[in-house]
Amino acid sequence: MDRRTFLAVATLGPAVGTAGCVAGGRVVQEQQQSILVEPGRGWTNEISEVDGDGELSYTVRAEQRFDIYYFTSTEAYDHYRAFLSGEEPPETPAGHSKFSRAGVHNEDRDLYEAKAPSDGGRASISVEDTHYFVVDYSNYGMGVPVEEHADPLDAFVDLAVFENTLPI
């Protein structure tokens, strides 16, 4: 990861931390880390700490193309895992449409980027079951094609999950 990318991502930390206080939410999960994903695999983060309604915000950046899948049920995630294991699941759920997307080339940064919401704020979630946030580097679901002998995906993940604390 080059210096510009690191500095751009590092400046988001304080903003995300104070946003939880200003908007009335409590940060229950935060990931800010570089990840390495082998071709044909995915990196998963389980989201289960939210008690009822909450909010989610993420930005993922990498030099290679990738997909983001956000599964709202263990059953949907199990289909994804089965696919990665070489099985042929009966279906390949695309994940929640509000959060699942392909990384798009950002001309200014010369990196691929996926973020939700697209304005950099937060989007509402309701966690009844464990949710799964996946940075995918496989050929799952007709997403971004990945060659078998491609280099590993080197990405930076900035993921924040908030629990609503305002009275209704």
Task: Briefly describe each language-model feature range.
Residues M1-I168:
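Terminal disorder- and signal-encoded targeting elements
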